[in-house]
From Swiss-Prot:
EC number(s) reported in the record: 3.5.2.7
Name by which UniProt lists this protein: Imidazolonepropionase
One GO BP: L-histidine catabolic process to glutamate and formate
Gene designation per UniProt: hutI
Cofactors demanded by this protein: Zn(2+); Fe(3+)
Record InterPro entries: Amidohydro-rel, HutI, Metal-dep_hydrolase_composite, Metal_Hydrolase
Gene Ontology cellular-component annotations: cytoplasm
Keyword Hydrolase assigned: yes
Keyword Transmembrane assigned: no
């Protein structure tokens, strides 16, 4: 679980985290990914949270993939604050968030709003303070139960809400009205062997924009294969091929606040292009469990060619 990974991350050096993360990014690049949102959240103390964010910054400079950083110290309540979740959030607000902002370590702030983790009121408290400091907002909500996280997302104008397997019709309506993007993580549902996938069709019918993302993490979703996630979007979320492609291109660009730079072929945008070995738009979602990437271009430069990083 999360706390097991927290223990391992606290013991890991910068170099160890960098090397492991670089391997994941290489794998993603080989599968056609050119921009990644990376979250902290496996430290739950300042030293380790900063180390994770420093790794993200270093890899953003060093790797062909562009990284967008999210600060998520509110991923869980650390063992040393067990039973004192509000006190831990106050520590984040008073000590961690100002330092993250001062050192420009992250663009977004996220929290896990779920029964047994943080309540809707606690999530509102943290995200309101983060918004005042100039952070863009995300929230993990409605993964196992609907406890008001999507209401917080709508009230505060969050860029996105993640998971949403248990989203209600009313919650979907509120998110659609507030233009909250639904970041759907079907590989997590698959990995946990759950039956309920996010109601993607209801979201689209309500006017929500959605993305499909890997949720790559060592606990609940140990995959970095976006093509597999796209296939789950078709098979388990009833999305069409065009809807899937929108979810991993222009909608994803909006979710990381890069819509003016990436996500579509437009004059003035960066030429991030993935060419698949596929005869039509349907084929990558029909021929599953295979990497179909032929070439990847980052800002117009060839970075992957026939299964190898250039």
């Amino acid at each position: 679980g999360i706390l097991s990974t927290v223990r391992a991350t606290r013991e890991a050096s910068f170099e160890n985290l960098y090397d492991k993360s670089k391997k994941l990014l290489d794998y993603m690049l080989l599968h056609g990914v050119t921009t990644v949102e990376a979250k902290s959240g496996y430290g739950l103390d300042w030293e380790t949270e900063k180390r994770q964010l420093d790794v993200v910054g270093a890899l953003d400079r060093d790797h062909d993939i562009d990284l967008v950083s999210t600060f998520m110290a509110a991923h869980a309540v650390p063992p040393e604050y067990k039973g004192r979740s509000q006190e831990y959030l106050e520590l984040i607000v008073e000590e961690m968030l100002p330092r993250v902002k001062a050192e420009n370590l992250a663009e977004f702030c996220d929290i896990f709003c779920e029964k047994g983790v943080f309540t809707a009121d606690e999530s509102r408290y943290l995200l309101s303070k983060a918004k005042e400091m100039g952070f863009k907002l995300r929230i993990h909500a409605d993964e196992m139960e609907s406890i008001g996280g999507v209401d917080v997302a709508a009230e505060l104008g969050a860029t996105s809400a993640e998971h949403l397997m248990m989203a209600t019709d009313e919650g979907i309506r509120k998110m659609a009205e507030a233009k909250v993007i639904g970041n759907l993580l079907p590989a997590t549902t698959f990995s946990l062997m759950e039956d309920t996938y996010a109601p993607a069709r209801k979201m689209l019918e309500a006017g929500m924009a959605i993305t499909l993302t890997t949720d790559s993490n060592p606990g609940s979703c140990p995959t970095a294969n976006l093509q597999f996630v796209m296939q789950l979007g078709c098979f388990m979320c009833a999305l069409t091929p065009v809807e899937v492609l929108n979810a991993v291109t222009i909608n994803a660009a909006y979710s990381v606040n890069r819509q003016d730079k990436i996500g579509s072929f437009d004059t003035g945008k960066q030429a991030d292009i993935t060419i698949l070995d596929a005869k039509n738009i349907d084929y990558p979602l029909y021929f599953f469990a295979t990497n179909l990437t032929h070439q990847v271009y980052k800002a117009g430069k060839l970075v992957v060619d026939q299964g190898r990083i250039v």
